[in-house]
Amino acid sequence: MENMVESGCGENSGKPLILVADDEPSILQYIEHVLQVANYRVITATTVEEAWKIVQQQQGEIELVLTDIVMPGSIDGQDLAKRIQQLDPALPVVFITGALSEADDRAAIMVEKQLLLRKPFFPQQLIDFVGAQLHRESPSGVAR
């Protein structure tokens, strides 16, 4: 089921918009809730295909993508990251996963040049991590 509704609107409309893609409803709801409490706007997707559609439709508005690596469908989180980097190289993509070993983590980071947040994580860890990514400089040298 696609969730194209942006949550956390209203008085927070000036806050960064984050896309979260995960096929586990409980994890998706947890991340969405934590980010909303931290005053971020959130769009969720339960498949990579949905996430890709949202990225295309909201290009220039989304400031960060959090995606699980292992997801059902014809493409996975790594494929999504590659597509996003071709469409918008300045848009940061963070992998969230609990499925990989430490060696696989390092390989994913080195090959894909992506950041990785390991599940499980505490709410404050997620908030701090997201805040740090939103304040990183983009490849053009401008802070996002």
Regions found by a protein language model. Give the residues of each.
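The feature encodes the CheY-like receiver
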Residues: L28, P72-S74
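Active-site residues of response regulator receiver
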Residues: D68-I69
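Hydrophobic/aromatic residues positioned on beta-strands within the core alpha/beta folds
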Residues: I96-T97
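Acidic catalytic/metal-coordinating carboxylates
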Residues: T46-E50, I75-L80
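Charged docking surfaces used in two-component/phosphorelay signaling
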Residues: Q29-V37
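Non-catalytic signal-transmission and effector/linker regions of two-component phosphorelay proteins
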Residues: M1-L19, P25, E32, E61, ...
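Two-component signal transduction core modules
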Residues: V65, L116-L117
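Acidic, metal-coordinating helix/loop segments flanking the phosphotransfer/catalytic sites
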Residues: T44-L64
